[in-house]
Protein backbone atom coordinates (compact mmCIF):
# COMPACT_ATOMS: atom_id res chain seq x y z
CA UNK A 1 0.00 0.00 0.00
CA UNK A 2 1.09 3.56 -0.55
CA UNK A 3 1.71 6.38 1.90
CA UNK A 4 -0.87 7.90 4.18
CA UNK A 5 0.10 11.46 4.96
CA UNK A 6 -1.17 13.92 7.52
CA UNK A 7 -0.18 17.49 8.15
CA UNK A 8 -0.60 16.88 11.86
CA UNK A 9 -1.17 19.87 14.13
CA UNK A 10 -0.30 22.50 11.53
CA UNK A 11 -1.66 21.67 8.10
CA UNK A 12 0.49 22.87 5.24
CA UNK A 13 -0.52 26.08 3.54
CA UNK A 14 0.68 27.46 0.23
CA UNK A 15 3.96 29.22 0.79
CA UNK A 16 4.48 27.75 4.28
CA UNK A 17 7.99 26.75 5.25
CA UNK A 18 9.90 25.96 8.42
CA UNK A 19 13.43 27.14 9.14
CA UNK A 20 14.52 23.93 10.87
CA UNK A 21 12.89 20.60 11.64
CA UNK A 22 13.34 17.28 13.45
CA UNK A 23 12.61 14.06 11.56
CA UNK A 24 11.38 11.02 13.50
CA UNK A 25 11.42 7.45 12.18
CA UNK A 26 9.61 4.42 13.58
CA UNK A 27 10.34 1.32 11.49
CA UNK A 28 8.42 -1.88 12.13
CA UNK A 29 8.42 -5.25 10.42
CA UNK A 30 5.69 -4.22 7.96
CA UNK A 31 5.24 -0.46 8.35
CA UNK A 32 7.32 2.69 8.33
CA UNK A 33 6.05 5.68 10.28
CA UNK A 34 7.73 9.05 9.96
CA UNK A 35 7.00 12.59 11.10
CA UNK A 36 8.56 16.03 11.07
CA UNK A 37 8.44 18.38 14.05
CA UNK A 38 9.46 21.96 14.54
CA UNK A 39 12.91 22.46 16.04
CA UNK A 40 11.46 22.75 19.55
CA UNK A 41 9.79 19.31 19.30
CA UNK A 42 6.44 20.88 20.15
CA UNK A 43 4.47 20.91 16.90
CA UNK A 44 4.07 18.04 14.48
CA UNK A 45 4.22 19.56 11.03
CA UNK A 46 3.46 16.42 9.01
CA UNK A 47 3.24 12.65 9.42
CA UNK A 48 3.22 9.66 7.08
CA UNK A 49 2.70 5.92 7.35
CA UNK A 50 3.94 3.54 4.65
CA UNK A 51 2.24 0.18 5.04
CA UNK A 52 4.88 -2.14 3.65
CA UNK A 53 8.34 -3.44 4.52
CA UNK A 54 10.51 -0.38 5.30
CA UNK A 55 12.98 -0.58 2.42
CA UNK A 56 14.60 2.24 0.43
CA UNK A 57 11.48 2.82 -1.67
CA UNK A 58 9.27 3.03 1.41
CA UNK A 59 11.71 5.45 3.02
CA UNK A 60 11.68 7.79 0.02
CA UNK A 61 7.88 7.54 -0.20
CA UNK A 62 7.66 8.62 3.43
CA UNK A 63 9.93 11.61 2.82
CA UNK A 64 7.88 12.65 -0.20
CA UNK A 65 4.67 12.46 1.84
CA UNK A 66 6.22 14.57 4.60
CA UNK A 67 7.48 17.13 2.10
CA UNK A 68 4.01 17.35 0.57
CA UNK A 69 2.49 17.94 3.99
CA UNK A 70 5.12 20.44 5.13
CA UNK A 71 6.97 21.94 2.14
CA UNK A 72 10.60 22.66 2.86
CA UNK A 73 10.75 20.55 6.00
CA UNK A 74 12.92 17.75 4.59
CA UNK A 75 15.65 20.08 3.36
CA UNK A 76 15.49 21.77 6.78
CA UNK A 77 16.07 18.60 8.84
CA UNK A 78 18.64 19.35 11.53
CA UNK A 79 18.41 16.04 13.44
CA UNK A 80 16.86 12.61 13.00
CA UNK A 81 15.37 10.57 15.83
CA UNK A 82 14.92 6.80 15.57
CA UNK A 83 12.69 4.65 17.74
CA UNK A 84 14.71 1.56 18.70
CA UNK A 85 12.92 -1.10 20.72
CA UNK A 86 15.81 -2.83 22.52
CA UNK A 87 18.92 -1.10 23.82
CA UNK A 88 20.09 -3.95 26.02
CA UNK A 89 21.84 -3.46 29.34
CA UNK A 90 24.35 -0.95 27.98
CA UNK A 91 22.20 1.64 26.19
CA UNK A 92 20.05 2.91 29.04
CA UNK A 93 19.10 6.31 27.65
CA UNK A 94 18.65 8.06 24.33
CA UNK A 95 22.00 8.58 22.65
CA UNK A 96 23.60 9.94 19.51
CA UNK A 97 24.26 7.08 17.11
CA UNK A 98 27.94 6.20 16.71
CA UNK A 99 29.53 3.06 15.24
CA UNK A 100 29.74 1.65 18.78
CA UNK A 101 26.06 2.37 19.43
CA UNK A 102 25.08 0.74 16.16
CA UNK A 103 27.15 -2.35 17.01
CA UNK A 104 25.54 -2.57 20.44
CA UNK A 105 22.05 -2.42 18.91
CA UNK A 106 23.03 -5.17 16.47
CA UNK A 107 24.28 -7.31 19.36
CA UNK A 108 20.89 -7.36 21.12
CA UNK A 109 18.86 -7.74 17.93
CA UNK A 110 18.26 -11.45 18.58
CA UNK A 111 16.26 -10.42 21.68
CA UNK A 112 13.90 -8.28 19.58
CA UNK A 113 14.35 -9.39 15.97
CA UNK A 114 10.94 -8.18 14.79
CA UNK A 115 11.81 -4.66 15.90
CA UNK A 116 15.56 -4.00 15.94
CA UNK A 117 16.27 -5.33 12.45
CA UNK A 118 13.96 -2.89 10.64
CA UNK A 119 15.14 -0.07 12.92
CA UNK A 120 18.75 -0.75 11.92
CA UNK A 121 17.78 -0.88 8.24
CA UNK A 122 15.98 2.46 8.53
CA UNK A 123 18.94 3.92 10.43
CA UNK A 124 21.25 3.01 7.56
CA UNK A 125 18.91 4.56 4.99
CA UNK A 126 18.51 7.73 7.05
CA UNK A 127 22.21 8.24 7.71
CA UNK A 128 22.87 7.90 3.98
CA UNK A 129 20.12 10.42 3.21
CA UNK A 130 21.00 12.84 6.02
CA UNK A 131 24.76 12.40 6.58
CA UNK A 132 25.48 15.81 8.03
CA UNK A 133 23.08 15.84 10.98
CA UNK A 134 23.04 13.99 14.32
CA UNK A 135 21.03 10.79 14.50
CA UNK A 136 19.57 9.86 17.89
CA UNK A 137 18.43 6.41 19.01
CA UNK A 138 15.51 6.65 21.45
CA UNK A 139 15.07 3.31 23.19
CA UNK A 140 11.81 1.76 24.35
CA UNK A 141 13.77 0.07 27.12
CA UNK A 142 15.17 3.32 28.51
CA UNK A 143 12.00 4.32 30.39
CA UNK A 144 12.27 1.17 32.49
CA UNK A 145 16.03 1.30 33.10
CA UNK A 146 15.69 2.55 36.69
CA UNK A 147 12.97 0.20 37.91
CA UNK A 148 13.51 -1.26 41.40
CA UNK A 149 15.77 -4.31 41.40
CA UNK A 150 12.94 -6.58 42.53
CA UNK A 151 11.06 -5.60 39.35
CA UNK A 152 14.06 -6.44 37.19
CA UNK A 153 15.42 -9.71 38.62
CA UNK A 154 14.02 -13.11 37.60
CA UNK A 155 14.04 -15.86 40.25
CA UNK A 156 16.31 -18.08 38.16
CA UNK A 157 19.91 -19.15 38.90
CA UNK A 158 21.94 -16.01 39.60
CA UNK A 159 24.59 -17.01 37.07
CA UNK A 160 21.99 -16.57 34.30
CA UNK A 161 22.03 -12.87 35.01
CA UNK A 162 25.79 -12.66 35.44
CA UNK A 163 26.62 -14.87 32.47
CA UNK A 164 23.87 -14.15 29.96
CA UNK A 165 22.43 -10.84 31.08
CA UNK A 166 19.02 -12.30 31.92
CA UNK A 167 16.87 -9.53 33.44
CA UNK A 168 13.67 -7.66 32.78
CA UNK A 169 14.03 -4.75 30.37
CA UNK A 170 10.47 -3.71 29.53
CA UNK A 171 9.29 -2.30 26.22
CA UNK A 172 6.89 0.25 24.70
CA UNK A 173 8.60 2.68 27.05
CA UNK A 174 8.10 5.73 24.84
CA UNK A 175 4.36 5.04 24.75
CA UNK A 176 4.12 4.38 28.50
CA UNK A 177 6.09 7.54 29.27
CA UNK A 178 3.78 9.77 27.23
CA UNK A 179 0.58 8.12 28.45
CA UNK A 180 1.55 8.41 32.12
CA UNK A 181 2.66 12.01 31.65
CA UNK A 182 -0.67 12.91 30.04
CA UNK A 183 -2.60 11.03 32.73
CA UNK A 184 -0.82 13.00 35.46
CA UNK A 185 -1.77 16.23 33.69
CA UNK A 186 -5.42 15.13 33.51
CA UNK A 187 -5.41 14.20 37.20
CA UNK A 188 -4.08 17.67 37.98
CA UNK A 189 -3.09 18.71 41.45
CA UNK A 190 -5.53 16.32 43.10
CA UNK A 191 -2.80 13.67 43.15
CA UNK A 192 0.78 14.83 43.66
CA UNK A 193 2.19 11.29 43.34
CA UNK A 194 -0.32 9.45 41.17
CA UNK A 195 -0.41 5.67 40.83
CA UNK A 196 -1.11 4.97 37.16
CA UNK A 197 -1.53 1.74 35.20
CA UNK A 198 -0.99 2.05 31.46
CA UNK A 199 -2.26 -0.63 29.08
CA UNK A 200 -0.62 -0.35 25.66
CA UNK A 201 -2.85 -2.62 23.59
CA UNK A 202 -2.07 -3.04 19.90
CA UNK A 203 -0.54 -5.84 17.87
CA UNK A 204 2.05 -5.80 20.63
CA UNK A 205 0.68 -5.39 24.15
CA UNK A 206 2.17 -4.40 27.49
CA UNK A 207 1.16 -2.98 30.83
CA UNK A 208 3.07 -0.89 33.32
CA UNK A 209 2.72 0.41 36.86
CA UNK A 210 3.91 3.99 37.25
CA UNK A 211 4.23 5.93 40.51
CA UNK A 212 4.80 9.68 40.31
CA UNK A 213 6.00 9.32 36.73
CA UNK A 214 8.47 6.50 37.48
CA UNK A 215 7.81 2.89 36.40
CA UNK A 216 7.91 0.32 39.17
CA UNK A 217 6.77 -2.74 37.19
CA UNK A 218 5.97 -3.82 33.65
CA UNK A 219 4.69 -6.93 31.90
CA UNK A 220 7.24 -7.33 29.10
CA UNK A 221 10.57 -8.73 30.18
CA UNK A 222 13.89 -9.91 28.77
CA UNK A 223 12.22 -9.83 25.35
CA UNK A 224 8.96 -8.36 23.99
CA UNK A 225 7.40 -11.85 24.14
CA UNK A 226 6.57 -11.83 27.86
CA UNK A 227 3.43 -10.56 29.49
CA UNK A 228 0.04 -9.89 27.95
CA UNK A 229 -1.51 -11.83 25.09
CA UNK A 230 -0.82 -10.10 21.76
CA UNK A 231 -1.72 -10.27 18.09
CA UNK A 232 0.69 -13.08 17.17
CA UNK A 233 2.75 -13.43 20.35
CA UNK A 234 1.72 -15.69 23.21
CA UNK A 235 2.75 -13.50 26.10
CA UNK A 236 3.70 -15.25 29.34
CA UNK A 237 3.76 -19.03 28.95
CA UNK A 238 4.72 -21.88 31.29
CA UNK A 239 8.43 -22.51 30.50
CA UNK A 240 7.76 -26.19 31.07
CA UNK A 241 5.76 -26.17 27.83
CA UNK A 242 8.87 -25.12 25.92
CA UNK A 243 10.95 -27.86 27.56
CA UNK A 244 8.24 -30.38 26.64
CA UNK A 245 8.18 -29.20 23.01
CA UNK A 246 11.98 -29.39 22.76
CA UNK A 247 12.01 -32.92 24.17
CA UNK A 248 9.28 -33.82 21.70
CA UNK A 249 11.58 -32.92 18.83
CA UNK A 250 10.37 -29.43 17.92
CA UNK A 251 13.36 -27.25 17.05
CA UNK A 252 14.30 -24.02 18.82
CA UNK A 253 13.75 -22.08 15.60
CA UNK A 254 10.29 -23.58 15.14
CA UNK A 255 9.30 -22.71 18.70
CA UNK A 256 10.65 -19.19 18.24
CA UNK A 257 8.67 -18.77 15.01
CA UNK A 258 5.45 -20.14 16.47
CA UNK A 259 5.56 -18.13 19.70
CA UNK A 260 6.31 -14.92 17.79
CA UNK A 261 4.14 -15.35 14.70
CA UNK A 262 1.52 -18.08 15.24
CA UNK A 263 0.27 -17.47 18.79
CA UNK A 264 -1.80 -14.82 20.56
CA UNK A 265 -5.08 -13.76 18.96
CA UNK A 266 -4.14 -15.54 15.74
CA UNK A 267 -3.19 -18.84 17.32
CA UNK A 268 -6.17 -18.98 19.67
CA UNK A 269 -8.87 -17.74 17.30
CA UNK A 270 -7.62 -19.39 14.13
CA UNK A 271 -9.00 -16.32 12.37
CA UNK A 272 -6.53 -13.45 12.35
CA UNK A 273 -4.03 -11.45 14.36
CA UNK A 274 -6.17 -8.37 13.63
CA UNK A 275 -8.33 -7.66 16.66
CA UNK A 276 -11.11 -6.22 14.50
CA UNK A 277 -11.42 -9.40 12.45
CA UNK A 278 -11.42 -11.55 15.58
CA UNK A 279 -14.14 -9.35 17.10
CA UNK A 280 -16.27 -9.67 13.95
CA UNK A 281 -15.84 -13.45 14.02
CA UNK A 282 -16.79 -13.61 17.71
CA UNK A 283 -19.92 -11.57 17.07
CA UNK A 284 -20.78 -13.99 14.26
CA UNK A 285 -20.68 -16.90 16.69
CA UNK A 286 -17.15 -18.26 16.26
CA UNK A 287 -16.36 -19.90 19.64
CA UNK A 288 -12.57 -19.80 19.25
CA UNK A 289 -12.70 -16.11 18.39
CA UNK A 290 -14.78 -15.47 21.52
CA UNK A 291 -12.31 -17.50 23.58
CA UNK A 292 -9.41 -15.45 22.19
CA UNK A 293 -11.07 -12.18 23.19
CA UNK A 294 -11.91 -13.51 26.65
CA UNK A 295 -8.29 -14.58 27.18
CA UNK A 296 -7.04 -11.21 25.93
CA UNK A 297 -9.29 -9.30 28.36
CA UNK A 298 -8.57 -11.65 31.27
CA UNK A 299 -4.81 -11.21 30.99
CA UNK A 300 -5.02 -7.44 30.71
CA UNK A 301 -7.43 -7.25 33.65
CA UNK A 302 -5.18 -9.44 35.77
CA UNK A 303 -2.27 -7.09 35.10
CA UNK A 304 -4.31 -4.10 36.27
CA UNK A 305 -5.19 -5.86 39.50
CA UNK A 306 -1.64 -7.02 40.15
CA UNK A 307 -0.17 -3.58 39.50
CA UNK A 308 -2.75 -1.80 41.66
CA UNK A 309 -1.87 -4.16 44.49
CA UNK A 310 1.86 -3.64 44.00
CA UNK A 311 1.42 0.15 44.13
CA UNK A 312 -0.93 0.04 47.12
CA UNK A 313 -3.77 1.66 45.21
CA UNK A 314 -4.73 3.14 41.87
CA UNK A 315 -5.58 6.66 40.75
CA UNK A 316 -5.87 6.17 37.00
CA UNK A 317 -6.04 3.49 34.32
CA UNK A 318 -4.92 4.46 30.82
CA UNK A 319 -5.77 2.72 27.55
CA UNK A 320 -3.49 3.51 24.61
CA UNK A 321 -2.36 2.13 21.20
CA UNK A 322 -4.56 0.67 18.45
CA UNK A 323 -6.91 -1.59 20.44
CA UNK A 324 -6.75 0.52 23.59
CA UNK A 325 -7.68 3.69 21.72
CA UNK A 326 -10.22 2.29 19.27
CA UNK A 327 -12.12 -0.58 20.90
CA UNK A 328 -14.88 0.43 23.33
CA UNK A 329 -15.81 -3.25 23.59
CA UNK A 330 -12.39 -4.34 24.84
CA UNK A 331 -12.09 -1.40 27.25
CA UNK A 332 -15.48 -2.33 28.71
CA UNK A 333 -14.55 -6.02 28.94
CA UNK A 334 -11.35 -5.27 30.84
CA UNK A 335 -12.95 -2.85 33.30
CA UNK A 336 -16.11 -4.93 33.76
CA UNK A 337 -14.86 -6.94 36.75
CA UNK A 338 -12.81 -4.16 38.33
CA UNK A 339 -15.68 -2.17 39.83
CA UNK A 340 -14.63 -3.37 43.30
CA UNK A 341 -11.47 -1.29 42.83
CA UNK A 342 -13.49 1.84 42.05
CA UNK A 343 -13.11 1.51 38.28
CA UNK A 344 -16.32 2.34 36.44
CA UNK A 345 -16.62 3.76 32.94
CA UNK A 346 -19.39 5.80 31.36
CA UNK A 347 -20.86 3.73 28.52
CA UNK A 348 -21.63 6.70 26.26
CA UNK A 349 -18.25 8.35 26.81
CA UNK A 350 -16.58 5.00 26.18
CA UNK A 351 -18.44 4.51 22.90
CA UNK A 352 -17.42 7.99 21.77
CA UNK A 353 -13.82 7.34 22.77
CA UNK A 354 -13.54 10.48 24.87
CA UNK A 355 -10.27 11.18 26.65
CA UNK A 356 -11.86 10.77 30.10
CA UNK A 357 -14.38 7.92 30.17
CA UNK A 358 -14.74 7.81 33.97
CA UNK A 359 -18.29 7.32 35.24
CA UNK A 360 -17.92 8.88 38.68
CA UNK A 361 -15.57 11.76 39.40
CA UNK A 362 -14.73 10.39 42.85
CA UNK A 363 -13.69 6.99 41.52
CA UNK A 364 -10.53 5.77 39.84
CA UNK A 365 -10.15 7.74 36.63
CA UNK A 366 -10.05 5.95 33.29
CA UNK A 367 -8.46 7.67 30.29
CA UNK A 368 -8.14 6.94 26.58
CA UNK A 369 -4.89 8.55 25.43
CA UNK A 370 -3.56 8.31 21.86
CA UNK A 371 -0.05 6.89 21.59
CA UNK A 372 2.52 9.57 20.70
CA UNK A 373 5.78 7.71 20.32
CA UNK A 374 6.80 10.11 17.56
CA UNK A 375 6.47 13.08 19.89
CA UNK A 376 8.58 11.38 22.54
CA UNK A 377 11.26 10.54 19.94
CA UNK A 378 11.28 14.18 18.82
CA UNK A 379 11.65 15.36 22.42
CA UNK A 380 14.46 12.90 23.08
CA UNK A 381 16.20 13.99 19.89
CA UNK A 382 15.98 17.63 20.93
CA UNK A 383 17.23 16.86 24.44
CA UNK A 384 20.06 14.59 23.32
CA UNK A 385 21.40 16.27 20.20
CA UNK A 386 20.16 19.84 20.09
CA UNK A 387 19.69 21.15 23.62
What are these model-predicted stretches?
Residues 22-25, 77-81, 136, 196-200:
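Short glycine-aspartate micro-motif
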Residues 146-247:
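Glycine-rich phosphate-binding loop of actin/hexokinase-like ATP-binding domains
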Residues 290, 294-315, 324-387:
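Internal helix-turn-beta structural module
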Amino acid sequence: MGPRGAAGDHRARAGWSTPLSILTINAGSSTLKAAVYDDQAETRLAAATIERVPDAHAFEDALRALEAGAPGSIDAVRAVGHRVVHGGAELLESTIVTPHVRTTIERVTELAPLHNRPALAALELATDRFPGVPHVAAFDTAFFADMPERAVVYPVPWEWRAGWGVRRFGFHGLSHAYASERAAALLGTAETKPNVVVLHLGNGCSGSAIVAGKPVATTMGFTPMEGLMMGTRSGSTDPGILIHMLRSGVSVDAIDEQLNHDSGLLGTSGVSSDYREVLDAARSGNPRARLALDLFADRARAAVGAFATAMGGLHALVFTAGIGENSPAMRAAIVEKLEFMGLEIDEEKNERGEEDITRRAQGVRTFVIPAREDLMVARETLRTALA
